[in-house]
Amino acid sequence: MASLTDEIKRRRTFAIISHPDAGKTTLTEKLLLFGGAIHVAGAVKSNKIKKTATSDWMEIEKQRGISVATSVMGFDYGDYKINILDTPGHQDFAEDTYRTLTAVDSVIIVVDVAKGVEQQTRKLMEVCRMRNTPVIIFVNKLDREGRDPFDILDELESELKIGVRPLSWPINIGAKFKGVYNIYENSLDLFKPDKQKVQERVEITDLSDPRVEEAVGETDAAKLREDLELISGVYPDFDEEEYLRGKLAPVFFGSALNTFGVKELLDCFVKIAPSPRPTQADEREIRPEEEAFSGFVFKIHANMDPNHRSCIAFVKVCSGKFERNAPYKQVRTDKVFRIAAPTAFMAQRKNVVDEAYPGDIVGVPDTGNFKIGDTLTQGESLHFRGLPSFSPEMFKYIENTDPMKSKQLEKGIRQLMDEGVAQMFINQFNGRKLIGTVGQLQFEVIQYRLLHEYGAQCRWEPISLYKACWIESDDAAALEAFKKRKHQFMAVDREGRDVFLADSNYVLQMAQNDFPAIRFHFSSEF
């Protein structure tokens, strides 16, 4: 029977992040295909293959062809247990993605070869840098026309502020794309497009082998040798330690849609990516190999099964062994829970599990007991760090349009806020509920889900606000004076913390100048 240490060593828990339409969900599908978790991949946003993408769960995702919630999937690959967190790709869904990055040990970033580094990728990379998360980059869509691979490497370094080292290299791109030379394994993989089936590799292990010319032609063979010479002269050798410290990103090239370059990425990933890492709590650092179980809730998902109004709390196991029906303490309330039906996920399929190990994500049925950031332990009081709320970018008042469905609306808003879809503030001046999101699409998602999952109808009333700032002060009198002066702009969040709603940058700066005793924060963690 495998020991705790053995189970930890074989686990790889990571997120795939990208700008919308870079091919992230497609890459996830193909990784599942190689893991034997699915046998046919569903082409995203295409009717050519009738199966809908495995990791897109919610009805609105299926309609729009974008992922709007974080999906969790696990599968075995060789000796390894892989846990993938597929994050929302749409630019409006940063908040859920920020939180997901607190539950993973490494990240794969997908970049479109035609578009290079985009805004969302930069923002997510900042969160990775805050936590020194190891990053691998997959440059996708090589079968389409795009930019020169060396230009892409330069942009990755300058925009993401991280060193890069190619571990595979494309032979031409677009219509002339012939394949990829795998630098890490010293093999040549020739391109044969296939959207559904796993490709066999065609291997040529030595670049001086005349079969290289036979495979790709004299011109491309000469260019490949020249490029590889340039790479070894310009880029540092791959240093695994630098990668694990979050300072160096290995880069792979391929076409996820055509299942090309994906296996090379996966084979290298399982070898170099970190197994579960220590987690920082306020009290101390928790190491995965500790005997006592601990874990935290990083996401709550309502109505994963439209037939049942159920919630699932996603718990990341940080240390020890999680066991079904064992008593675990919820640190926030001091209550003890025995979880009778914990689940593991393969996209839509949920299986009841008897045990889980560090790095695993366990689904816990929730009837309203759990909140994002909750800690479960075998008794020790631990508070894990790194689940802040950030100031939303857009704000709207939510109005009930059907007074007969007030209860349903209240319940729906509460559950959606528990999921972290958006943030809710209560305006202290007029008592109205204010919803804050990272972008416009989230308002549409909330409205759609309230109607289809709770039978409640709402409308939105826009309000022009610049930022929501959490405020605090060591001087109680100064805090009261500020709240009195700014009473029209004061709100509380769901935890009852004071929030100042600044309607412009100028108003915020004036408030900071006029009230030096008040500290203003753009994140709830201070």
Predicted regions located by residue number:
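Structural and coupling elements of P-loop NTPases
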Residues: 1-526
